[in-house]
Amino acid sequence: MSHKACYTNPGAGVKRPRNDTGNKLTVVLGAQWGDEGKGKVVDLLATESDIICRCQGGNNAGHTVVVDGKEYDFHLLPSGIINSKALSVIGNGVVIHLPGLFEEAEKNEKNGLKDWEKRLIISDRAHIVFDFHQAVDGLQEVQRQAQEGKNIGTTKKGIGPTYSSKASRTGLRICDLLADFKDFSMRFKNLAQQYQAMFPTLEVDVDGQLKKLKEYAERIRPMVRDGVYFMYDAINGPPKKILVEGANAALLDIDFGTYPFVTSSNCTVGGVCTGLGIPPLNIGDVYGVVKAYTTRVGIGAFPTEQLNEVGELLQTRGHEVGVTTGRKRRCGWLDLVILRYANMINGFTAFALTKLDILDVMDEIKVGVSYKLNGKKIPYFPANMDVLQKVEVEYEKLPGWKSDTSACRKWEDLPVKAQNYIRFVEIHVGVPIKWVGVGKARESMIQMF
């Protein structure tokens, strides 16, 4: 478009077309309370991606990926790092615990991860998680337990305190660590002192920490880039497949989740723009990952929870134990109110439905289809936790298929009653299901379209 065309009679109010250019990002997000199997969907898409990004959270996420019979555990590294042909990006919205990053990489190196340093790009605007943030995380949990008789159930990875430092403008970023170290040291000491004033029992070995941080600075220096410019370049350069791997999930989002039992970042689609510094225009497909039943770690309202043999069966058959915490997960029936709510916020292109095979032994399967409050149906998902505790779930009963689906590789292989379950979810949420997972391995994801 010539300059002349842009500025013809500005008073005439001619609407200029927006430049719809550049590569689109494919986004994978959790649609429940986490642990939906996002790592598996990311792994599937990562094989053909050029760039794989993390945009929020820290090493509180837990993704397990199985490749060639080897199991890799990722917490902070994008799980696409196992793709040797792709670049992996840790965006500005991620909080980085440097010892955790290297520990995780070394652990995965033992399983065969190679040359990850050459493929990792770290945004210079990302905030740093210090050891004292992790210590404070633990102390705050103890405090909450003492004051309220309950805690949030954080992973004690320092995520919340780091985002608090960020919001109160006392945090330190990767760019600060790589700039004047004297200035960094002074700000580090001040931050440590602030926390010590709040928590008198907190011990911080300032000099020891700074010495380690100086070493980490040199190790990460080659990986650090201006994240905004890097993403702009990637979007506006030659055609590239860019994938964003969400951590946590919709109901753990700081704004839209079951507050206060949430994480400290936006794990919905808005967090992709703010956590990477990209325009909404460049967001392409947004895939929601949904487990065929519901699980939750820690406390907080859980309307479809089954504190009975159904819950126990799901827990044992599904091996529902947290990757990061090792805690048993609470289990219940699939809740479509949650999925509709997650879709209102994220606008999903399609769902990936995982762990369908866990339901193989059920005679009858229930699905939560709506909530009633004081006898009246409500069209929204309640914000207040006490209100959410009180909702009455209306269920639909579906017959179980009572046969092993773990060997199914295409839609036609699935029992008719399993097909009906899938269609039921699609119709009632209004989002198509693109993949169905029936096992741990890469091959056990049935692609529907």
From Swiss-Prot:
It is found in: Cytoplasm. Gene3D superfamilies: Adenylosuccinate Synthetase, subunit A, domain 1, Adenylosuccinate Synthetase, subunit A, domain 2, Adenylosuccinate Synthetase, subunit A, domain 3. Substrate binds at residues 35, 323-329. Keywords: Cytoplasm, GTP-binding, Ligase, Magnesium, Metal-binding, Nucleotide-binding, Purine biosynthesis. GTP binds at residues 34-40, 62-64, 329, 355-357, 437-440. The keyword Metal-binding applies. IMP binds at residues 35-38, 60-63, 155, 169, 248, 263, 327. Binds 1 Mg(2+) ion per subunit. Mg(2+) binds at residues 35, 62. Belongs to the adenylosuccinate synthetase family. Component of the purine nucleotide cycle (PNC), which interconverts IMP and AMP to regulate the nucleotide levels in various tissues, and which contributes to glycolysis and ammoniagenesis. Catalyzes the first committed step in the biosynthesis of AMP from IMP. This is Adenylosuccinate synthetase isozyme 1 B. Its main location: cytoplasm. NCBIfam families: PRK01117.1 (NF002223), purA (TIGR00184). Pfam families: Adenylsucc_synt (PF00709). Homodimer. Its cofactor is Mg(2+). The keyword ATP-binding does not apply. One of its GO terms (molecular function) is magnesium ion binding. Pathway: Purine metabolism; AMP biosynthesis via de novo pathway; AMP from IMP: step 1/2.
